[in-house]
Amino acid sequence: MDEKFWEKINTFGENGEFDKVVREIKKLPEDKLDIELINILGRSYMNLGDYENALDTYLSFIGKAKEDVKDVDIWLYSECGWLCNEVGDYEQGLKYLLEAEKLGRDDEWLNTEMGQCLGRLERPEEGLERLKKSLKLIEKEAPENIDEKIFINSEIGFLNGVLENSEEALKYFYIAKDLGRNDNWIYMHLWLNLENTKGKEEALKYFEDEVKANDKNSVLWESLGQIYMNIFQDYDKAEKAFKKAFGLSGDGLNLYNRGIALRLLGKYEEAVEVLLQSRKISVQEGDVTDGEDLDLARCYVALKDKKNAEKYLDLAREGLENVPEEHADEFEATLEEIEDLIEKL
């Protein structure tokens, strides 16, 4: 390809005009396509959310490279496997990854991808075998890749949890945490497996000791707040934990959770104040507000403020389209419940 062609392709890519990248490459005769162009075309389809054409692009080039056919095909099968896994087609993804393995690929990336895939296919023992192999391989291939080590240890912990091997799960979750993982996912999985092995009170003690030692960790405070609120129904401690988490992070989700805790404590006026602040942050960040609207409607019902209760119920109803499908029925039932309560005011 001439320099002008590549300038055009690069400009379109930098501007996010991936439809134009596709159009330019599709104009080319088939014999002009090489692995570089196939890669760009496939990635452009992915950026457009067109995973089917991305997959077809990669599959169509298998066996057609003019040189290094085996290496190119390994890359193509690997890419197809990764792509299928990204869209949740783990069965097909595994087939493509196995094809890459048959051609000779046997590195950390492939084993990690296959381990994750097998886990999602409810084949945890096989997944663990692959992931443990990955841990050994990464020490040889990229010992400095901490993020990948965190991921592998987290997946091994998760699959052990699936198998109800909580002691073994904890071992790997602790490693992931010590390597730097600090999110709700790791803390909730630590909670579940600590609860299974030591009981709720001991599990709670672990988290309370952790926040004492890491008082500035907003994520840890948020996780503790969730434990207080959802496991122990201790809304007073939950409210204080979420307040601390928000003070450290400024994350509106912590403010929202604090508002829920205040509502559950019956402190409706304070809850309204906090939920309105949370809603303002959500609007500023372009986020949905259906959760705040629903809880505001509940608070205004409790305060016998029919006008505002109706206002936020209507806003919550408008947000129904943003609710994940698996929660839509529950959300609609809650809307109807609040509507009935408003009618009685």
Go through each PLM region and give its residues.
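Residue-level recognition of tetratricopeptide repeat
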Residues: 10, 43, 82, 116, ...
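Structural motif corresponding to the intra-repeat A-B loop/turn of tetratricopeptide repeats
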Residues: 15, 48, 87, 121, ...
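TPR-repeat structural position
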Residues: 18, 51, 90, 124, ...
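Canonical positions in the second alpha-helix
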Residues: 27-28, 61, 99-100, 133-134, ...
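Short coil turns that delineate tetratricopeptide repeat
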Residues: 32-33, 66, 105, 139, ...
